[in-house]
């Protein structure tokens, strides 16, 4: 459930969530989270969303870059993510950022619908 995400991010050390907006209109968001079961040096890129109007503007790349920078500041050396093959453009962007495919999931994210797993050293 997303009902209490603000409280979850606010109360979890080494987590962060960022939103992108223009003229008061929400365009997207992305965050990092030390997902349960991941190694201590690894966080997850989570809740990466863009509105349809924001796609193709480079905003996703900016948000990923910012998340990777903050992850490094927080002391993480790897960033993990889970996605789906249907999100071809997103997967392509992750590959361009240097994320590599994994054969199985890491941690206990609870994302049963995601069947692609990727990781990047930072």
Short names for language-model regions:
Residues 32-33, 41-45, 58-60, 94, ...:
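Surface-exposed beta-strand edges and their flanking turn/coil or helix-capping segments
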Residues 25, 38-39, 51-65, 73-74, ...:
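Conserved glycine-rich acetyl-CoA-binding loop
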Residues 77-79, 84-122:
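C-terminal "cap" of GNAT-fold acetyltransferases
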Residues 1-53, 64-66, 70, 105-107, ...:
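Acetyl-CoA-dependent GNAT
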